[in-house]
Amino acid sequence: RVGRWVAIAGCGHTEITDAVVKPVLSCTVIGKSKRLIASSGAKSGDDLVMTKYAGLEGTSIFASDKIEKLKNISEDTLKEARDLSNLLSVVKEGKIASQMGANAMHDVTEGGILGACWEVATCSGLGVEVYADKIPVLDCTKQICSELGVNPLRLISSGSMVIAIENGEELVAELAKNGINATVIGKFTNDGLYIVNKGEKQALDEPDVDELYRV
């Protein structure tokens, strides 16, 4: 089916190599938008909203690819973790956030939720305060990350999105009406990149190697 659409598009390149053991498909889409919401559009005073949960994709990958290191985790928990792969699209929340007047949006991939917060703040030329205790983490993610010794807040989190918007709670309520969990986890400021944990401020560092690659 992919080959049929490539033929219709009139382009494509296929290569077979021993180094790649699974199919890899990439594409570039060019189009027009009435309003572009980039990662660089956050404004000082905006709420920082996060959709879904930290570490979604990383949790699913671990539960599928690192079974030999997760023998202490129940099969029910592993199944729940693997099923998180069904939550990786952010199209729905992106459309809603756009309609609600979001100033910036960024999908959370490598570097995890903390990396995404750092990226939006620096791209926007702002500071940010991220409230660590507000970041939602599923129990299956906590169990698996604890077993593997990794930080879920620095784990690839495709399926989650960070959004800068003036009234975060209104967006959270609208997303909830559409079955999407969302949480206000911080605020954009004029300067300073911080994680606030139990009332204490710590520097929010530039993202390093994703926790996925440390296992």
Each predicted region: which residue ranges?
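Helix N-cap motif at beta-to-alpha junctions
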Residues: A164-E170
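Short, solvent-exposed amphipathic alpha-helical segments in soluble enzyme
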Residues: S64-E68, C117-G125, C145-L148, A173-N181
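Acidic, Ser/Thr/Pro-rich beta/coil linker or hinge segments at domain junctions
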Residues: A176-V215
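Active-site-proximal betaalpha loop/short-helix elements
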Residues: R82-S157
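Active-site glycine-rich loop that binds ribose-phosphate moieties when present
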Residues: S26-A38, D76-A97
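Glycine-rich anion-binding loops of enzyme active sites
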Residues: R1-I67, K187
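Structural motif
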Residues: V6-I8, V24-T28, D46-V49, Y53, ...
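Solvent-exposed alpha-helices and their adjacent loops that cap or buttress functional pockets
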Residues: I16-K22, S39-K43, I61, I73, ...
